[in-house]
């Protein structure tokens, strides 16, 4: 994303004049989420200043700051003290989506481990991240009826998921 991210963290890049992070905060609030944890690493001070406590959006935001970029799982583990004991929704703030977050907040979706939102493979990731076999996420090397060598059964992680805290224990 350089040069766009040379002085701006990806979550603060704008789409239609609005930062990506704000798009998510507003849509999450519209889905009924009022308590959020925002993870910040690269240029974290800008994200901290932008979010504040969340009051301007009618939500409560707690900030988790990574000492250095830890990738998705590392950032979640760092934020665990703020996330509590119930399943929680994770949205990568550097994506733009019209996904209906409320669909993941239903009790029948709350996982014992994790529930990943997968999408068709984009051109830049044709091999995908996972195979989906019998509604179970599997490593991309496993194939269902499509057979070995077929990419038909592979999908890409969207950056949206619901996790149970035990998944990271």
Segments and roles (model prediction):
Residues 6-10:
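Short alpha-helical oligomerization interface
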Residues 1-4:
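A phosphate-binding catalytic loop at a beta-strand-loop-alpha-helix junction
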Residues 11, 59, 86-87, 114, ...:
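A generic secondary-structure signal marking the coil-to-beta-strand transition
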Residues 13-14, 18-92, 101-103:
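Conserved N-terminal catalytic core of the sugar/cofactor nucleotidyltransferase
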Residues 73, 97-169:
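Conserved core of the sugar-phosphate nucleotidyltransferase
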